Amino acid sequence: GTGVPRPRFALVYNGELYNDAELRAELAARGVRFRTACDTETVLHALAHWGTQALARFRGMYALAFHDTLLNTLLLARDPLGIKPLYFHVDERQLVFASEPHVVAGHPEVPCRPNLAMAAAYLTTIRTVLGNDTLYEGVRTLRPGQMALCEFGGAHPVVALQNAPRGRWGAQAGRGAEISA
């Protein structure tokens, strides 16, 4: 080995955090040292510090994957308004994710078959929201404000879908009425 320690946390993030300065200041006051001025680093430190409860503090649009190498877990999350999409496939060997369903379906290890039931539902009802299923069999999506907690310690990945913690939306947390997405 090179003697360089492997970082505990890794983040794949697509989005924009509107309250970056506020969260960055709070984390810095708690001893977090920042190396960049990028909101991606704020998201990484917030998730490392607060876990999934950090999602309730985020104001912005995002889709993310946060890996904890010590616990061998992966958090997938999507913003409450669903501005940034997130698709995934999981089987006994792997988890594949991307911001577009055809990218997941086109992965060489993902069987690409049409989801005929979803195609029929889409064509007969003109629905644009299909829950977690997509037009590709085995490719799922996170609904707005949803997260997937993935554990990789056993014989195959275990994925639990649930609603992400929600905070208050508005100019500042704690002011005004709470708005549900």
Segments (PLM) and residue ranges:
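Cysteine-centered catalytic environments shared across enzyme families
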Residues: G1-A181
